[in-house]
Regions:
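Conserved "right-hand" nucleotidyltransferase catalytic core of DNA-directed polymerases
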Residues: 1, 74, 99-305
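Active-site-proximal helix-loop-helix substrate-binding element of RNase H-like nuclease domains
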Residues: 3-6, 10-24, 30-133, 140, ...
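A short, polar/proline- and glycine-enriched secondary-structure boundary/capping micro-motif
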Residues: 25-27, 298-299
Length: 306
């Protein structure tokens, strides 16, 4: 950790930088049990505060989450975009000069400039909260806190042995499916929209459709950017995932990469649940960190594992 900026209520913002031990002593001097911690993208800052320094406040708050629910995609969620929208100041660019640097790489002058940059970020975040938080529903602040805690203070334990066994099973099933495809299905069948649609129907899945912008007529939604086709990559039937992966030329299915990701996490500890508050215009949560915890299979052998 290079340093941190901290503001208590409307007092002056402090910049702190030092060894891990010095930073721990500094943070231990605050009454977190009776405090709310605010940041912009608190999932990131909160994880560092909790995982490295044991900070566990009464409430976590996040101006990024609040902004998504207020502005959607109309303004932008970055601190820079929001600060310009509310005309409260300008976000600095010193962080770009610090990419790849450790604390010991900074000169005294560089560290001082970086501290000023951090202080400015804190002031902008505080001002944003003052502007957006006045009429913000308290019950939604509680929802934001609960959402953040699922990542910052993880409690879900993963069964490493079961996951490793599941990964072997998934890969075996994929190999068998691809062998069966190779016996009766060629690359041209996978790339032909009509024949690929027939393969999907053979698995009991109706192919997704869309209106072609070129012809104005209905056609199959098999482009890799089509929402319906992307949904097939996350289909609860593994056979569908494997079929789509084969068409795309991918070596791994979503089930494989997701299971491997869970295995890597299990070796480190509990599962932080990375979901974003108000990720869509409907207000629903969205997945993050390449793990959509909301889209795990619920039926079949995969549903018993994931």
């Amino acid at each position: 950790v290079i340093g941190l900026g901290l503001k208590v209520n409307n007092g002056p913002t402090e910049w702190a930088s030092g060894t891990d031990e010095q930073m721990q002593d500094y943070l231990d001097s605050f009454d977190w049990a009776n405090s709310m911690v605010l940041a912009h993208n608190t999932m990131f800052d909160g994880a560092i505060l909790n995982w490295k320094f044991g900070v566990n406040p009464k409430v976590w708050a996040d101006t990024l989450s609040m902004a998504r629910s207020i502005h959607g995609t109309g303004v932008g969620g970055s601190l820079k975009a929001l600060s310009e929208h509310y005309q409260i100041g300008q976000k600095g660019t010193e962080v770009l000069d610090a990419l790849g640097k450790r604390r010991e790489d900074f000169t005294d002058n560089d560290l001082s400039r970086y501290g000023d940059y951090c202080i400015n970020d804190v002031e902008l975040t505080y001002d944003l909260f003052s502007l957006m938080g006045g009429k913000y529903p308290r019950k939604e602040l509680k929802v934001i806190d609960a959402t953040l805690r699922m990542f910052i203070d993880p409690v879900l334990e993963l069964d490493l042995e079961l996951l490793e066994s599941h990964l072997i099973d998934v890969r075996d099933r994929k190999e068998k499916l691809l062998l069966n495809l190779e016996d009766g299905v060629g690359k041209e069948d996978l790339m032909s929209n009509d024949k690929f649609a027939g393969l999907l129907r053979g698995l009991g899945v109706e192919p997704p459709r869309k209106i072609s912008p070129a012809t104005g007529k209905e056609t199959y939604a098999f482009a890799k950017t089509d929402e319906g086709f992307k949904a097939l990559q996350e289909h609860e039937m593994y056979e569908v995932q494997a079929l789509v992966a084969a068409r795309l030329g991918n070596k791994s299915t979503l089930e494989e990469t997701r299971t491997q990701r869970f295995i890597d996490i299990a070796k480190r500890g509990n599962l932080p649940v990375p979901i974003r508050y108000y990720a869509a215009h409907t207000g629903r949560w969205g997945g993050s960190d390449k793990i959509n915890i909301q889209n795990l299979p619920s039926r079949g052998p995969d549903g018993k594992t994931l």
